[in-house]
């Protein structure tokens, strides 16, 4: 790779970091090392240290000695007269070391090198009778007026005014006065002083108190001249040596500046200088207005750091906390995600139940008292259906079985769908009229399914309404004939599958003519799919193409039977009529002149792509515009196409689904019920729980003693079983049955043995006194029997997505607790010339298990292969590291002990040319010194962006400079910038 290419790639590089338990290297297997040092077989010098090595040993001279280890000699630190071992007075060499001493009148400073003046006057006034005056390196005694100092230089003698002897106050000697034989006086000086030419004054020399110099002294004609040791400066007094910033930073904690009077200390932002003028004390910014932090303020040395409560993240201003919208992440919830301040909640679609915190599994309703079915129960995805044995068919309530030939007098005759056509201006338009039982299911923006009517009794299962039957049963007018079925596929060019109200005014139409004269249309399904198809020619734009798949079910009109045309004849005639109708429909659909009429509104099945619609027109069928969003009409309402708004269901109808175009007639024909009924139980007139009747409607009678019924509108009651009775009639639950023992949660009552039985593995029971256990949702199971809650149900599947550039591994049932005795193995094999970077945002493995649950990453399955990472503990701080091998074999195992949340570990593969840079970043402790940096490795959006750029550096240009600043803290960007700049330096 050329220098320019490397620079270009690295200038756009963003990277991550590491902390954690990483495996170290190991020696060669099979070799036994001999420790010569401990056995004393080495030949190191007595002043050397023996250090064992894998194959031999080596000798190192001790500190203070020089040589190659087998011969060592003392280093004379004092031999350099200029530096003098750093001693300002005298340097004394000792074997392997040295020490500093000071002249009389001085003492050694704490640094062991400098010499400070001793104030002798502090100790018994220096022995002076009257006045003691301290001086650098010495002191002198003085007397009060009228006295003079005696020869011992400590006591004072009263002066006389007579004569010229030494007792006279005017004898003129500076130090010592001696009387001469002739009666005169002679002056003398104390040791270390020379008598001046006037024979009275005394001149100081370097021999007394080091000449008054703190460090070095040199005698000159004018007296001692002072000097200072290296790195010290002479004070303006000409005697004292002051520290400079070159010596121990001038004694300053932080910043040192040399001045004429000595060093001046200062402190950086976040510290304040203490009264000693040298020490810096940290300022606790959190004491004032919480440091400006929204949530938490944590004081640090010289600064502070803001933190946020769980569920919030710190913005790049490093003060403000913002709620984390977990619902914006991929794979947060299986079905529905609802964000809330600091948290989120996962919900499941109807017929599913939540497990493992975020996952949705199908509820096996049949495991709960047989789904309340009278006979058989068949579980389906998101629902279930009751089935009946031969000779019986399902009641309108979808639970009870009634005789096939038995009519329900209160049930309405199923309204018929109708296919018809009309002409306007020579153009033929066709219509599908759905008077009732319309189901609209939008699969996607450009796909939907519309069904109209009710399948025949011998056809496939009843029309499903979000997993439940339509609630219709046989009526006295329903024909038991086998329906005629036909499937056709139509193609519409330049059209999209948008089911929208048809508002365009059409010319006056001729009367609509039915397409099927000799039959009844009982059920029609229309499935519309749109896709783009590229035209011939590279520059030709792609065109929208829609396909409509129609399935028809028709029944013959038995009332038209005659001697000349019996049942077979009528059926053949109906089939011919259906074929002709399909031909007519094909022409109509091809011209985009096909409409569906529901609840008085005509809808275009597919239309030409138009300009972007605004307002209500931008929403699909079954949706209305609220707060600039398209929202589906809720249960209890239907979409009124002409009004463009949601309309409540009329009394006598109900709607238990969202986004529908009509309401379903109630099974009762009395028109009772609530307006806006959300399910069939709100239709009115049904028997209440604990009661039943032949058709499920009033008048009703109470369930006899020994039976119960928990649901409304039923035709019978369930027996308690095992000869158990109830205290009274009209009971609604098995809990009303007088069982001989009261079972606790995790158990069910066996009516044969009259004992409580623990729920088997794979089931649970959260309530008291039940006669069944609930099967775990989906493909989950429990770790043990007797489970009391759905949270004990765990998915056994090992999660993850392994890609060449990015991917992740996930413990089973994450983020719920993983199951017992789980074993997962993943293999990461990156493309050539790429290396692996792994981030563990957090990992939860119970340490109480004595490492029974382990995650290990190695080169291969062999226990002796190179290990990159291994842990059996919980770490809530992020961990990141590069793989020690090009490929990774990863294993997770759990035992039967405690369980934990587990882990979700993302990884990225990067160009091996960046290996040095990545290693430099991930091994820098500053990456983890800040909680803000740690949160980056936990933020799924930021990790995704970082991995995107690491895997594909050119993708950096997707993120603007402003976006990068808004995504990452300044300190993080600064850290990366310095690393990248240093790495690029050789290429400049």
From Swiss-Prot:
Glycans are attached at residues 370, 466, 679, 750, 779, 789. Residues 798-910 form the CUB domain. It holds the Pfam family Ephrin_rec_like. It is a peripheral membrane protein. CDD domains: CUB, EGF_CA. Disulfide bonds join 37-50, 44-59, 61-72, 78-91, 87-100, 102-115, 121-132, 128-141, 286-297, 293-306, 308-321, 327-337, 333-346, 348-360, 366-377, 373-386, 388-401, 798-824, 851-872. SUPFAM superfamilies: EGF/Laminin, Growth factor receptor domain, Spermadhesin, CUB domain. GO terms for cellular component: cell surface; external side of plasma membrane; extracellular space; plasma membrane. Could function as an adhesive molecule and its matrix bound and soluble fragments may play a critical role in vascular biology. Forms homooligomers. Forms heterooligomers with SCUBE2. Forms heterooligomers with SCUBE3. This is Signal peptide, CUB and EGF-like domain-containing protein 1. It comes from Homo sapiens. The gene is SCUBE1.
């Amino acid at each position: 790779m050329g220098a320019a290419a490397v620079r270009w790639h690295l200038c756009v590089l963003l990277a991550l970091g590491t902390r954690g338990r990483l495996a170290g290297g190991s020696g060669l297997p099979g070799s036994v090392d001999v420790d010569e040092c401990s056995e004393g077989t080495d030949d190191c010098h007595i002043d050397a240290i023996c250090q064992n090595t894998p194959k031999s040993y080596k000798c190192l001279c001790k500190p203070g000695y020089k040589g190659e280890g087998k011969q060592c000699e003392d280093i004379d630190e004092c031999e350099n007269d200029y530096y003098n071992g750093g001693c300002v007075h005298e340097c004394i060499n000792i074997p392997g070391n040295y020490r500093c001493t000071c002249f009389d009148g001085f003492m050694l400073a704490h640094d062991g090198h400098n010499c400070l003046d001793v104030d002798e006057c502090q100790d018994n006034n220096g022995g002076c009778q009257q006045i003691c005056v301290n001086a650098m390196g010495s002191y002198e005694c003085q007397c009060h007026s009228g006295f003079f100092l005696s020869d011992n230089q400590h006591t004072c003698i009263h002066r006389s005014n007579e004569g010229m002897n030494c007792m006279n106050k005017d004898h003129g000697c500076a130090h010592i006065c001696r009387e001469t034989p002739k009666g005169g006086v002679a002056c003398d000086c104390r040791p270390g002083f020379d008598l001046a030419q006037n024979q009275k004054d005394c001149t100081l020399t370097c021999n007394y108190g080091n000449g008054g110099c703190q460090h070095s002294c040199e005698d000159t004609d004018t007296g001692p001249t002072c000097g200072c040791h290296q790195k010290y400066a002479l004070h303006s007094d000409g005697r004292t040596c002051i520290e400079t910033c070159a010596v121990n930073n001038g004694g300053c904690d932080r910043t040192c500046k040399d001045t004429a009077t000595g060093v001046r200390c200062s402190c950086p932002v976040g510290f304040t200088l203490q009264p000693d003028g040298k020490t810096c004390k940290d300022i606790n910014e959190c004491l004032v207005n919480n440091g400006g932090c929204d949530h938490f303020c944590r004081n640090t040395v010289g600064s502070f750091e803001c933190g946020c409560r769980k569920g919030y993240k710190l913005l790049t201003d490093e003060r403000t906390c913002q709620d984390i919208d977990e619902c914006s992440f991929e794979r947060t919830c299986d079905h529905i995600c609802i964000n809330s301040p600091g948290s989120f909640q996962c919900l499941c679609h109807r017929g599913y139940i939540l497990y493992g915190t975020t996952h949705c599994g199908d509820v096996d309703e049949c495991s709960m008292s047989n789904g309340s079915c009278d006979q058989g129960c068949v579980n389906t995805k998101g629902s279930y259906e009751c089935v009946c044995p031969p000779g019986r068919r399902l009641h309108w309530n979808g639970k009870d079985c009634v005789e096939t030939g038995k009519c329900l007098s209160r049930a309405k005759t199923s309204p018929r769908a109708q296919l018809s056509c009309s002409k306007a201006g020579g153009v033929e338009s066709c219509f599908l009229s759905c008077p009732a039982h319309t189901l609209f299911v939008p699969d996607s923006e450009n796909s939907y399914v519309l069904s109209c009517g009710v399948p025949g009794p011998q056809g496939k299962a009843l029309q499903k309404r979000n997993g439940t039957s339509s609630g219709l049963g046989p009526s006295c007018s329903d024909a038991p004939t086998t329906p005629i079925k036909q499937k056709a596929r139509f193609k519409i060019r330049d059209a999209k599958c948008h089911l929208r109200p048809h508002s365009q005014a059409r010319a006056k139409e001729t009367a609509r003519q039915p397409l099927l004269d000799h039959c009844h249309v009982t059920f029609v399904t229309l499935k519309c799919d749109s896709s783009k198809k590229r035209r011939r020619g590279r520059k030709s734009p792609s065109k929208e193409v829609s396909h409509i798949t129609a399935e028809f079910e028709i029944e013959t009109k038995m009332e038209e039977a005659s001697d000349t045309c019996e049942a077979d004849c009528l059926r053949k005639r109906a089939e011919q009529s259906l074929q002709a109708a399909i031909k007519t429909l094909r022409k109509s659909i091809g011209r985009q002149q096909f409409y569906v009429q529901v609840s008085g509104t005509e809808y275009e099945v597919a239309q030409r792509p138009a300009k972007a619609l605004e307002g209500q027109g931008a929403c699909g069928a079954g949706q209305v515009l609220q707060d600039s969003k398209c929202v589906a009409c809720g249960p209890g309402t239907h979409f009124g196409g002409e009004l463009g708004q949601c309309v409540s269901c009329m009394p006598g109808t109900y709607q238990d689904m969202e986004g529908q175009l009509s309401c379903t007639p109630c099974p009762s024909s009395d028109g009772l019920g609530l307006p806006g009924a959300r399910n069939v139980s709100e239709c009115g007139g049904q028997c209440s729980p604990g009661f039943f009747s032949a058709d499920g409607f009033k008048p009703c009678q109470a369930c006899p003693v020994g039976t119960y019924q928990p649901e409304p509108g039923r035709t019978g009651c369930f027996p308690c079983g095992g000869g158990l009775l109830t205290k009274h009639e009209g009971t609604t639950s098995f809990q009303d049955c007088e069982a001989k023992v009261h079972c606790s949660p995790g158990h069910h009552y066996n009516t044969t043995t009259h004992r409580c039985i623990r729920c088997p593995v794979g089931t649970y029971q959260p309530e008291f006194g039940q006669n069944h256990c609930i099967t775990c949702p989906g493909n989950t199971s429990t770790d043990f029997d007797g489970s009391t809650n759905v949270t004990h149900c765990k998915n056994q599947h090992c999660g993850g997505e392994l890609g060449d550039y990015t991917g992740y591994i996930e413990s089973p049932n994450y983020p719920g607790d993983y199951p017992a005795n789980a074993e997962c193995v993943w293999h990461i094999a990156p493309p050539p010339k790429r290396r692996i970077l792994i981030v563990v945002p957090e990992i939860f493995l119970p340490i109480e298990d004595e490492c029974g649950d382990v995650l290990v990453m190695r080169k291969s399955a062999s226990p002796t292969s190179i290990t990159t990472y291994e842990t059996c503990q919980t770490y809530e701080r992020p961990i990141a590291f590069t793989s020690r091998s090009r490929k990774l074999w990863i294993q997770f195992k759990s035992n039967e002990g405690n369980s934990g949340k587990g882990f979700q570990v993302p990884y990225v593969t990067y160009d091996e040319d960046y290996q040095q840079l990545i290693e430099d970043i991930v091994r820098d402790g500053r990456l983890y010194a800040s909680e803000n940096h740690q949160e980056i490795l936990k933020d799924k959006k930021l990790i995704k962006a970082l991995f995107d750029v690491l895997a594909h550096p050119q993708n950096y240009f997707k993120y603007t400079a402003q976006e990068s600043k808004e995504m990452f803290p300044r300190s993080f960007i600064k850290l990366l910038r310095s690393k990248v700049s240093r790495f690029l330096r050789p290429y400049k």
